[in-house]
């Protein structure tokens, strides 16, 4: 009976009503459940009207024929109750026949079966994939300080032709080694690092910032930007070491992957601090708010910076989830077409797992319309990064070629951005 009551109700989709206003049964004043047979009624009056019409019942009022029907007395006078049903617009034409009820039941069952089949075929994030996502999220959070507090350890930014109040004035004591940051243990020397000879000791030792002057002059921002990039390299090494499967690679392949991808991952990560409002990277205070002019004062030109800003804008507009962002960084690092790799098949298998996880995550967790072609757009961003990487390499070589500039770079930069692949 409950099924028939549900299936013989017709919801009038053309009738709009305020959802905040209580819906009252037009027959007895009880709480209404919707439009039934063309009128707003409760379940009780709906069933009463349907039964009365099907039985073609004839009722007689034992009183004066004008009984006031309420929730409490609606069973006392069926005649006045039925009259009230008709008065508020309930129509027997809206009642389905037994054949119509059967057809509707079949349609509902068919729809439920189709929905169940569709749900069973919907991609689901496996336990293994979820574990991978969780590991990458933890790795990212351990190696990305959203407070940017370590930026105070860099050689200070010296900006030409800017308000002098924006410049940092700091005694040389800030360049001495202080207490390590919360996640610095990620980068300290470990048995694994010595076993594999991973880059040089500088990659795993506590990063020490040079006290080399931040005097105004040619490429005045280069010392600060060099420290920022070196710091970012340290963080990305820590992130890469925690990618599932990365440590399964031989040391030479780990080094080759990082040397080839690190600038691309820096560009990816920097998108978190990029603002569409003023096209700048804000890393905490105003002193660490970087615009294109700042990077030109570190030796780079618009051949790199114009497409870089375009890349940052496009990536920001994708509105990636943090899960998608960390997976994209891992996919970028684990690229089997990097130069100097010995076991490309293993790198490819790790990247395939990451890519599959990203596609599944998008299907399961990223609602439309944002998910439309999202995976393809993200992969295109990796292709854009290759072009940016190539241009960065050209400009870096020009900067590092001159001794007066290369002396402002860090040993880590000189090692990582060298053309030598082990």
From Swiss-Prot:
Keyword list, A-Z: Cytoplasm, DNA-binding, Metal-binding, Nucleus, Receptor, Transcription, Transcription regulation, Zinc, Zinc-finger
Region Interaction with coactivator LXXLL motif: start-end pairs: 241-259
Binding site for Zn(2+) 2: 61, 67, 77, 80
Residues reported in the UniProt entry to bind Zn(2+) 1: 25, 28, 42, 45
Sequence positions that bind calcitriol: 232, 269, 273, 300, 392
Residue spans binding DNA: 22-90
Zinc-finger ranges (NR C4-type): 25-45, 61-85
KW DNA-binding (keyword) present: yes
Tissue expression per record: Detected in all tissues examined. Highest level in small intestine and skin.
Region (Hinge): 98-127
GO cellular component: cytoplasm; nucleus
Annotated localization: Nucleus; Cytoplasm
Described purpose of this protein according to its UniProt entry: Nuclear receptor for calcitriol, the active form of vitamin D3 which mediates the action of this vitamin on cells. Enters the nucleus upon vitamin D3 binding where it forms heterodimers with the retinoid X receptor/RXR. The VDR-RXR heterodimers bind to specific response elements on DNA and activate the transcription of vitamin D3-responsive target genes. Plays a central role in calcium homeostasis. Also functions as a receptor for the secondary bile acid lithocholic acid (LCA) and its metabolites.
Comment block on domains: Composed of three domains: a modulating N-terminal domain, a DNA-binding domain and a C-terminal ligand-binding domain. The 9aaTAD motif is a transactivation domain present in a large number of yeast and animal transcription factors.
Family: Belongs to the nuclear hormone receptor family. NR1 subfamily.
Protein name per its UniProtKB record: Vitamin D3 receptor
Organism field: Xenopus laevis (African clawed frog)
Gene that this polypeptide is encoded by: vdr
């Amino acid at each position: 009976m409950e099924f028939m009551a549900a299936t013989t109700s017709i919801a009038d989709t053309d009738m709009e009503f305020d959802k905040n206003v209580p819906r009252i049964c037009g027959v007895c004043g009880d709480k209404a459940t919707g439009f039934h047979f063309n009128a707003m009624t409760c379940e009780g009056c709906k069933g009463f009207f349907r039964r009365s019409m099907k039985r073609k019942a004839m009722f007689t009022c034992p009183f004066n024929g004008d009984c006031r029907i309420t929730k409490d007395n609606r069973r006392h006078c069926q005649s006045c109750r039925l009259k009230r049903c008709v008065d508020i617009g309930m129509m027997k034409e809206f009642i389905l026949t037994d054949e119509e009820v059967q057809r509707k039941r079949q349609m509902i069952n068919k729809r439920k079966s189709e929905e169940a089949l569709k749900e069973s075929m919907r991609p689901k994030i496996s336990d293994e994939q979820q574990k991978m996502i969780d590991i990458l999220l933890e790795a990212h959070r351990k190696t990305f300080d959203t407070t940017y507090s370590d930026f105070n350890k860099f050689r200070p930014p010296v900006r030409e032709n800017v308000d002098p109040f924006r410049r940092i004035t700091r005694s040389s004591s800030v360049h001495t080694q202080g207490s390590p940051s919360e996640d610095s243990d990620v980068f300290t020397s470990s048995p694994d690092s010595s076993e594999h000879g991973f880059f040089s000791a500088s990659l795993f030792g506590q990063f020490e910032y040079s006290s080399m002057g931040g005097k105004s002059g040619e490429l005045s921002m280069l010392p600060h930007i060099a420290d920022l990039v070196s710091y970012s390299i340290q963080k990305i090494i820590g992130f890469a070491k925690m990618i599932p499967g990365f440590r399964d690679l031989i040391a030479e392949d780990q080094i080759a992957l990082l040397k080839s991808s690190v600038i691309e991952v820096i560009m990816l990560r920097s998108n978190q601090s990029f603002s569409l409002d003023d096209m700048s990277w804000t890393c905490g205070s105003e002193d660490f708010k970087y615009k294109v002019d700042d990077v030109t004062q570190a030796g780079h030109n618009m051949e790199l910076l114009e497409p870089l800003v375009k890349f940052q804008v496009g990536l920001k507009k994708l509105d990636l989830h943090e899960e998608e962002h960390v997976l994209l960084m891992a996919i970028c690092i684990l690229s089997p077409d990097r130069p100097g790799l010995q076991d490309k098949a293993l790198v490819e298998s790790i990247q395939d797992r990451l890519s599959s996880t990203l596609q599944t995550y998008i299907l399961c967790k990223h609602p439309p319309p944002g998910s439309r072609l999202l995976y393809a757009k993200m992969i295109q961003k990796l292709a854009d990064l290759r072009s940016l990487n190539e241009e960065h390499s050209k400009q870096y070589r020009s900067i590092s070629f001159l001794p007066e500039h290369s002396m402002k770079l860090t040993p880590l930069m000189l090692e990582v951005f060298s053309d030598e692949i082990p």
